[in-house]
Amino acid sequence: MKTYKTLAGIGALAIAAFATITIMKNSSENPQEDGFIGRSEITVENGHMTPEVLLAFGRLSDPQMSPDGKHILYGVSYTSVEENRSVRNLYICDLEGSDNQLITKSDKSIVNARWSSDGKHIAYIKGGQIWTAKVSLKKGKWALSDERQVSNVPAGVGEFKLSPDQKKVMYISYVKSHVDKPVDRHADLDKATAYVSDDLMYRHWDHTVLEIPHTFIADFDFGGSEITPDNSVDILAGEAELYELPTEPFGGLEQLSWSPDGKYIAYSCRKLVGKKYAFSTNTEIYIYNVETGACQVIDMKGGYDTDPVWSPDGSKIAWISMERDGYEADKQRLMMAYVDWTKGEPMVWGITDATEDFKYNAAGPVWSADSKNIYFNSLAEGVQGMFIAKGPDFDAPAGSKIKPAPWKVERITDEDMWYDFGSPFHVAENEDGSTTLYTTWCSMDFPTELMAVTTSDFGTRYTSITLENSHILSQLAEHETEARWLDTVDGKKMLTWVLYPPQFDPSKTYPAITICLGGPQGTLSQGWSYRWNYRLMASQGYVVVLPNRRGTTAFGQEWTEQISGDYPGLNMQDYLVAARTIKAEPYVDKIAACGASYGGYSVYNLCGIHGDVFDAFIAHAGIFNEEHMYMTTEELWFPNFDNGGLHEAEFDPRVGTPECPVGPAGDGVTFGGIKQGGSPWSTEPKAVRHYKLSPHNLVCNWHTPLMVIHGGMDYRVPVDQGMAAYNCAQMMGVPSRLLIFPDENHWIIKPQNAMMWHREYFRWLDQWCK
């Protein structure tokens, strides 16, 4: 058994070392605007973490190293529950983190901040437009001056990225989609609220798709030349269809990368629309000529190809790739291609899987300065570490028939470090031959902070930079976390985290919570969450059990893929193994199961099969009726594969012709020209079993108190799933409660709604488990 205390190891040392000197200096040269939300000075009573304490934490993000490598620009969001909003402002710190200064005091969130190459300006987004300002350091104080808005884009700017010479900018804005509003069809109906669609993908995540993102290019200078639609170029101009760039709903400019000379852009795009879009994950990497608009494709003919990054010398491109179309949890391979410039235009050759012999997923690729190696992060055995893919010493000449030499992957962060590390945002090669990776880190015990990881022949050194929340963390009572490897019903090993309440005494008894992970493909790692916060749950007096059941993504692809086509099967037994194991401990009394999304499906399923294991359930945004879910969710590739189809997305181009009329193809899986092996009308055995064992078919077995939570704007798992589950619980005479948030999506985001969620969550658990 391996046990760490809260903020164990370097976390505890960092808090002890800097808690007394981490002071946010507010320069008088930076005026405070009405509506500014600053750092919370909350007092924690008796070391007890509460939802109020959770929402008081500052949320650090998007660090950017200064051009001279001496300072870091980053943002922190603070929340006012009373005002029901959060505001993000900017900070600058030195590399030791002992001089953190607040440099903006805006009443509107400031995001996407970037340095000028001389370090004298920054550009950022405020109020949906690009702004610039001068930044200066005088007598130890940072100050902004000469703020000016440099974009005037009516549809708004979502994000921007400057070219390497900073003479151009690419930015995300929005164009009309295929979905019509009333005034698009009837000019006199300007107060009507309907929408009209003749194809799929008319809604996505939490919104009607009335507009889609496109990426535009414009000239840029920090002096303030205005950027407008009239002087911007749409990268997708001239395409036959309305494609997205970047891909909805969460894609950003990490999906586009400037070449080192600024003349080309590599980007990821799914050039599909309507039904084909809804059933496919096939994005490709394209190379766009900024001057001519010409475009070429790196055609992988598979699933997601995302996150392209040019090497600093322009000789290579790296990206993340999934092999199979329609399967969004396929292995994330780190791909690399050579770029030949001998004919003036970039010609791609020698595509190589740099992680071919690495069994985990890769994410967040970052090139080394010499263009020989690629840094990335990966969830491996329950924690997210940093890795390096080392390129071969010798590259085959361009156009050579010699197969490029393999790459070698090495771990950078130590295997026993119970923290999640991001990819580096800056890599520094030091005079002594060591390399320092500036990155982010967090754990179940503290939110994201900045960290420097220095590697050399003598080992790895970790240096905490920021401690934005040390004033809160230092007030909280410590607790213990344990990693258990449990035996599954089929003789495999399953990592299960267990968090114990503060002042845990094994001679006493405590209630427990088994967490059912969403996804279903994901991982219960050392991440920090403001929605499902396990330290908060432990602080409420619960033993928190986190089983990395079948389908989780940090234990190799075989463990991940087993769940597809087997939702009612082994992963449900994994939950029961974890729950029965902890319930057998003398210090555990009653136990609940709680989960969101697929975790909500798990809860509804366990309601019908658990017998007398659990004493209460909470399902948030859970799938209840799989048949109806297939017909109402938006990204249809997901249930089509995972519900038992297990096929790559395939389309019959002959559909609608005499030789292939619309309708069934006679193979039991192809309908409307689309292979729908995971549909309710499929004859695939796994799909038939999947729908037969949908949770709604097991409600006659329900007898345990159930709370149902759902967002009214959830289009991934529509709200009627939760309403149906609650109605059935009521019909079965099961004690039940319904909590609906009409203005929230799959997640509960607004501060007062988040507070309501937490209070009602614990009220239900306390009622039935304490």
Describe each PLM feature range:
Residues N30-I37, R88, Y174-E241, S268-K271, ...:
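Predominantly five- to eight-bladed beta-propeller fold
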Residues E52-R88:
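Beta-strand-rich domains and repeat architectures in extracellular enzymes and scaffolds
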Residues F57-I72, D107-A123, P154-V169, Y202-T215, ...:
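Conserved beta-propeller blade repeats
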Residues Y78-E82, K176-V179, L272-K275, E323-Y327, ...:
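Short glycine/acidic-enriched loop and turn motifs that connect beta-strands
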Residues D94-S98, V135-K138, F220-G223, N289-G293, ...:
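Short loop/turn segments that connect beta-strands within beta-propeller blades
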Residues D118-P182:
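Hydrophobic or amphipathic alpha-helical targeting/insertion segments
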Residues G459, E468-K590, A596-S597, M631, ...:
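Cap/lid segment of the alpha/beta-hydrolase catalytic domain
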Residues A538, L546-K770:
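Active-site-proximal cap/loop segments of hydrolase catalytic domains
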